């Protein structure tokens, strides 16, 4: 079984629900005929909700992939609250008709997993990022860049499932979590990442490139060393007369003495 898609076609999280719906639908059909229609509708809905199709995975090492299906609701410069650094934030909102299986956006090593309890407001709202129940995965890419991807519960989705932990290595496109019935995923990338999507765009999990992240961080240019200040010659004042000035004063004194001698004669 493919390691990147260990639960082909239908996510394992839906097996009990789909199995129960199918059994109940068959039972009601045998007993009540057309009265079983609502149960069949529910079973079909569960089948489409828990679908988990395999997708082509772009292998460009600079490509950061969308971890889920959905619609882009945020593309902005923001503060990564888990690392306390400036970041490029990209948020994806999932409605009940999207695939809700979450997959790794890059080849990376998980460094930390942070779970926060919270509310269950509409995941389409910006405040859901800070107020709702959420689970953040902090990771370092194969090239050493730090990224953060956050599972955010929604108004209906009240169960975040995360199957990874600190120290785990994830391949791009590898399944790591699931959120049931509508939710949101926030991505925090280094500020030099270049967004490839805009607000309102629809994205497909692991097949859509959200951003391009250079393999190396930009070099911070060091400030040039300041040149030593030029030494200026001391300003000559009356207290420090020049040789020329002393000669002039000496000649003037001789002339004055000669004039006085003439006057005495």
Swiss-Prot record:
Its cofactor is pyruvate. It comes from the Bacteria. It is found in: Cell membrane. Residues 218-242 are annotated as: Disordered. Coiled coil: none annotated. The record marks 182-183 as: Cleavage (non-hydrolytic). It is an enzyme of class 4 (lyase). Pathway: Phospholipid metabolism; phosphatidylethanolamine biosynthesis; phosphatidylethanolamine from CDP-diacylglycerol: step 2/2. GO terms for cellular component: plasma membrane. The keyword Lyase applies. Keywords: Cell membrane, Decarboxylase, Lipid biosynthesis, Lipid metabolism, Lyase, Membrane, Phospholipid biosynthesis, Phospholipid metabolism, Pyruvate, Zymogen. The active site is at residue 183. The keyword Plastid does not apply. The modification Pyruvic acid (Ser) is found at residue 183. Is synthesized initially as an inactive proenzyme. Formation of the active enzyme involves a self-maturation process in which the active site pyruvoyl group is generated from an internal serine residue via an autocatalytic post-translational modification. Two non-identical subunits are generated from the proenzyme in this reaction, and the pyruvate is formed at the N-terminus of the alpha chain, which is derived from the carboxyl end of the proenzyme. Binds 1 pyruvoyl group covalently per subunit. It catalyses: a 1,2-diacyl-sn-glycero-3-phospho-L-serine + H(+) = a 1,2-diacyl-sn-glycero-3-phosphoethanolamine + CO2. One of its GO terms (molecular function) is phosphatidylserine decarboxylase activity. GO terms for biological process: phosphatidylethanolamine biosynthetic process. It is a peripheral membrane protein. Its EC number is 4.1.1.65. Catalyzes the formation of phosphatidylethanolamine (PtdEtn) from phosphatidylserine (PtdSer). Belongs to the phosphatidylserine decarboxylase family. PSD-A subfamily. Heterodimer of a large membrane-associated beta subunit and a small pyruvoyl-containing alpha subunit. This is Phosphatidylserine decarboxylase proenzyme. The gene is psd.
